[in-house]
Amino acid sequence: MGLTKKDIGLRIGAFGAEPWTESMRKEIEERLGLKGYNIYGLSEIMGPGVSYECQEQHGSHINEDHFYPEIINPETLERLPNGEVGELVFTTLTKEGMPLLRYRTKDLTSLMEGECPCG
């Protein structure tokens, strides 16, 4: 195409829909000259925008005014404490037409409590 990073002029990219590795992130950032951020969503809930990375990139912020997240043991279905890896489960708080109650995502992750350095 003959375009350079300067020609494109992108500074930020938000990427979702599929998991990516840190090496993939680094390659995209280097090739396009931008800072890449992860955005998480589920089409069953609302698509992108369930959670997103901030500039600190210490994990994703969940939009807790719309979603109640839990982590469960996928075999026993017992709720796990913060910091332990398990299956992510969501309850929607603001969907009126088709609310989801403890929707199992099949995604493995953990929840962190506390304040992010971004504020």
Segments from the language model and where they lie:
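Active-site glycine/GP-rich loop and adjacent strand/helix microenvironment
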Residues: 1-119
